[in-house]
A protein has these predicted regions:
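Long, positively charged leader/targeting segments at protein N-termini
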Residues: 1-174
Length: 174
């Protein structure tokens, strides 16, 4: 078993009292949207193949979907872009700037991870999950980066802002 039994660090699996920590944030909307998308996919599969419901519950399906979401690698195999689950490669923690690169080596028929710099013996090997804002890290991977800054000082964190116009505002007509 190389996949986690629980994904309780991911907010779509949080209890209602834990979700109160996110009150007022756009992340709550994204969590609900993700739950709805997973429920709709589950329903579509069950509608097409009713026996699926006897094999897999919505909770199990949600767990599997989030395992894929948090652990798949985009790769190119023989010129075809695809995604792959790569056991143990998904155990690398996130760090920026990037210290490794990964690819599918067609000549070896293997997924490879290459260090981009010297890593001391016994040192942790990191992967970069990309330049993302903390709400994406939390939604998709179950963690946030304390000082989420790039080397150039850029901070990819985003803040969603809802702006409502009064019905009589001329911009409303546009």
């Amino acid at each position: 078993d190389v996949l986690p039994g629980s994904l309780s660090n991911m907010p779509i699996f949080w209890k209602p009292n834990e979700l109160t920590w996110l009150e007022g944030s756009y992340l709550l909307v994204q969590i609900e949207e993700r739950k709805c998308a997973i429920q709709n996919d589950f329903k579509a599969i069950v509608d097409a193949w009713p026996a699926f419901k006897r094999i897999c519950t919505l909770d199990e399906f949600s767990w599997a979907r989030m395992c894929v979401c948090s652990r798949n690698f985009g790769i190119v195999i023989n010129g075809v872009r695809t995604s792959a689950m790569v056991p143990y490669a998904d155990m690398l923690n996130h760090f920026r700037p990037r210290e490794t690169k990964w690819t599918f080596d067609n000549t070896r028929g293997a997924f490879t991870i290459t260090a981009l710099q010297s890593i001391p013996s016994g040192g942790q090997i990191y992967d970069s999950y990309g330049q993302k804002c903390n709400h994406r890290f939390l939604l998709n991977y179950g963690f946030a980066v304390e000082d989420n800054y790039e080397c150039d000082g850029y901070c990819p964190n985003e803040v969603a802002l809802l702006v409502r116009l009064a019905p009589e505002d001329p911009l409303t007509a546009r």
